[in-house]
Amino acid sequence: MKNKWLIALFSMYSFFGFSQNTSNEILNLDFENVKDSFPVGYDVFGQGNYDITSDSKILQNGKYAVLIQNSSANKVGESFKALAFTLPKNYKGNFIRLKGFIKTENVTNGYAGLWLRIDPEIGFDNMNDRGIVGTTDWKEYEIVLPLDPKNTKNIVIGALLVGDGKMWIDNLQVEIDDKKIDSDEIEVFVKELLPADKDKMFDKGSNITITDLSQESITNLELLGKVWGFLKYHHPEVAKGNYNWDYELFRFLPQYLNAKNNKERDVLLVNWINNLGNIPECNNCKVVATDAVLKPEMAWVENSNLSTELKKSIQYIYQNAKVDENYYLKFALGVNNPEFLNENIYVDMNFPDDGFRLLALYRYWNMMQYFNPNRHLTDKDWNVVLKEYIPTFLNTKNRLDYELAFVQIIGDVKDTHANLWRGGVELYKLRGENYAPFRAEFVENKYVVTDYYNPEHAENAKLKIGDIITHINGKYVTTIIDSLRIYYPTSNEASFLRNVSIDLLRSTDSELELKYKSNNQVKNHTIPLFKRDDLNMYHGYKIDKDAKSYKILEGNIGYVSLANIKDDEIPLIKSDFINTKGIIIDIRNYPNTFVPFQLGSYFVTEPTPFVKFTYGSMNNPGEFTFGDGPLIESDGNKYKGKLVILVNENSQSSSEYTAMAFKAVKDAKIIGSTTAGADGNVSRINLPGGLGTMISGIGVYYPDGKETQRVGIVPDIFIQPTIEGIKSGKDEVLLKAIEVINN
């Protein structure tokens, strides 16, 4: 799935787990069981104005199909609606196939398709890279994903419509290893419940209240958080799932909070550790790689004023424990980014109690401590962050405070991949759901109107393209930015300004008072605000998915935009551009499909390295070592012209990875400005209260070992748009690329 906003929104929606009912009627895959004009057993989620109903007139089979249509009066940006059904069982097998018939009418600004998700983060496909557009007759489509029944909690199927138009779905089928799901040959997988799975004692709350926030108490809670996290990822008995480690914290906390002094505190910790079980001696269990890029941070054991016995207990576990599998962790096959398992999200806890808020902080801090490949790149020493945030989390008074606390600590990770992607309901309300009808961005360090989402609102809004906004509701824009900085997690300044620029013109009110400069005249005007669904909003750049991604510019220069590139266009690009003077690849966007190797093969004559990665360790958490990166192979028909790549702050993650690949081409030039500085496959994190975030799960480096995280892809020629260029409608970055090719 390529659309990051769609990834985030899909990850927000949770579904009930496996049930005991397996009858075909309950599955209702043919949509024939209907109540109140809607298929029984299905859920709906998404954003935007859509209607989903049973349709008895247009159908492929039986008496009913399902119709999804965009009912908005205006074209809607970044909206979708999905039909969802959770399969009642977990199944033995190697792969699952979802098939279904789809018919479409005037699908634009998006696509229609099936979708299949295996939770938690085991597999996902929503046909984004091969979605159905336009008007099409009934045709069967399918999705296939590998199964992992041992770790599966839910399997969810469905269909979705992104953007505008109509789609009909009918006659879904699910197969396990080519056998229909209702076949007698299908075997249900019954997962063996471990003690950690069976422990439900604190499902309704921790019953923990923490009132003493003296410096001594905070120091003790910091120590507990570090010991708790160390044991979670190092002790074999915890790793086996023999303990619900969340709830063991709640069992231990009451006596720990009552410890009268450090001696009593340390005795409690030693006894806690000893009661987990014995660990046999191992002479070669913990050998830190000599070439490790990052080594485990264990200095806290020596620097925390611990008793000798407690130090020995921790050091013994570190030296002798061998953990090859962990109930709470695995590394993704083929990619090796961490996958955090069995982390209960406690979605029913709107405002978690003291114990659960402390747990949330401990969980997140330790994940970063042991499995963030970029922990050395934070502005703050991560070792001191835990202590700083203990009073912040425990002093929160409501859900909004809790969300804001997490946004702040996520921000300290300095990763544009990281944000409060799920569960930020009160934060969303605080920022408001009303938006200006125009877009403003930071150009030449000024907040400049760059585009109207809906030109029909220009007359009432008054501001023109190129106008400079200086004040919002009487406050300097610069003052507002400084006050918001801690609530926008990003890797660097470029991505921060990109993200905050949209929300500056967002409010709970129906209008905003603006002071601005227009042709050197200072003006004031109150602009109306609109609901997102009433505007053609977009993030960073516009996409016309129906247009070709490539063209030949004046002067015989090839141009390719990766925003809407399709796999089947790549051979055409190679053939059509073979005699051009140069090629410009525009990655000031997010690639619609993955092109580094298929398109990159056009520009090299031999296997070419362009990247290498660092990976974490299961047996030595906190250690990160280099692994070899892939090579771009030649297709034997190298392009002979010049190659220029365009980047800016909208170039993030896969965009940056792609830019790195093309940068490896001899004499290629990168033109533009600082990219978002967040690359590598993401790892998702569940947090109490229904919150969710992510991190960049692997370290991404150039072959010579230079960092890309936070730094981004550094242009060979630095150029940004100017206010005059914005006013005149010029793409100055593109013009510079043309100049470079012509010279």
Region annotations inferred by a language model:
Residues 1-23:
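Bacterial Sec-dependent N-terminal signal peptides
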Residues 20-194:
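Extracellular and organelle-lumenal recognition/adhesion modules and their flexible linkers in secreted
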Residues 194-201, 403-459, 544-551:
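PDZ/PDZ-like peptide-tail recognition elements
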Residues 203-205, 220-342:
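Cationic-aromatic interfacial patches
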Residues 208, 216, 232, 257, ...:
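Cleft-lining beta-strand/loop regions that shape enzyme active-site pockets
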Residues 217, 222-225, 229, 298-331, ...:
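PDZ/PDZ-like domain segments forming the peptide/carboxylate-binding groove
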Residues 227, 231-235, 364, 460-493, ...:
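Conserved PDZ fold ligand-binding element
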Residues 237-270, 372-417:
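Amphipathic alpha-helical substructures
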